[in-house]
């Protein structure tokens, strides 16, 4: 018989600042340290990322958009055609961190501005 047992943790962080941006502005990344992603998660678990659809200032009520219970979330990877310069964001992970990578054929500048100040929800599944 097969027995499934797992633990799920959710971590929410605010995105601010890039750790690396290429000179031509077509690639960049952010490293976010998440100690809950341990060796067991890397070996046999999973990590998913979701970016908040709203941030402070998106509504007339400036506080709206910070309540994670009412928030809408977009699953990563995410391709946005909304901007003049379409960009792609994807999530990778390793022991103790996630890396959010941005790519565009033209420029990631608009996507950096879009994500700045937004929340990133990380869902970590540890198999036991």
What is each stretch, according to the model?
Residues 2-48:
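Extracellular receptor-binding modules and their adjoining Ser/Thr/Gly/Asp/Asn-rich linkers
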Residues 23-27, 90-97:
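Short, ordered beta-strand-loop transition motifs
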Residues 33-91:
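Mature extracytoplasmic domains of secretory-pathway proteins
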């Amino acid at each position: 018989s097969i027995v499934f047992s797992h633990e799920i943790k959710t971590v929410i962080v605010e995105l601010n600042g890039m750790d690396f941006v290429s000179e031509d502005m077509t690639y960049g990344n952010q490293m976010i340290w998440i100690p809950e992603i341990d060796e067991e998660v890397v070996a046999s678990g999973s990590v998913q990322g979701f970016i908040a659809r709203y941030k402070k200032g998106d509504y007339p009520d400036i506080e709206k958009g910070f309540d994670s219970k009412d928030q809408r979330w977009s699953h990563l990877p995410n391709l946005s055609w909304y901007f003049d310069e379409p960009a792609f964001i994807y999530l990778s992970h390793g022991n103790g961190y996630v890396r959010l990578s941005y790519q565009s054929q033209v420029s990631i500048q608009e996507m950096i501005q879009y994500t700045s100040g937004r929340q990133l929800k990380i869902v970590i599944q540890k198999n036991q």
